[in-house]
Amino acid sequence: MPKSIVRTYSQYTKEALTLLSGLIRAARIERKLSTQEVAERAGISRSMLQRIEKADPKCEIGAVFEVASIVGVPLFNAELSSPKLANNIKRTEEKLALLPQRARKPQKAVDDDF
């Protein structure tokens, strides 16, 4: 049986997870939605939703984003179904088109001057 990998997360990551999970929990409670109701709408288990609300870093990012969308927490400074998000996606795709497909380390120049 493979050993479980122990990961460490930066302080910034931990704080961002805590913030997002708090926003999700607050929005759910403000909208008077039960954990079971949100979990069913997101297609996840109730225990997964509880882990999301406790800022567990091992939760799938897609599940976290779906729950945020369901309870009305805007992501990336954009309102739900906002053209602003679509514009950001387009700009990112344009930038990626200009960049090389792979990131390669620069090779050391050979000094062959004698």
Task: Say what each PLM segment does.
Residues 2-30:
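A short, Lys/Arg-rich alpha-helix, primarily the initiator
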Residues 22-37, 66, 93, 98-103:
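Short basic helix-loop element that most often maps to the first helix and adjoining turn
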Residues 32-48:
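Short alpha-helical DNA-recognition segment
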Residues 42, 50, 75-78:
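Short amphipathic alpha-helix starts
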Residues 60-78:
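DNA major-groove recognition helix of helix-turn-helix/homeodomain DNA-binding modules
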Residues 78-114:
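Short, charged recognition helix plus adjacent turn
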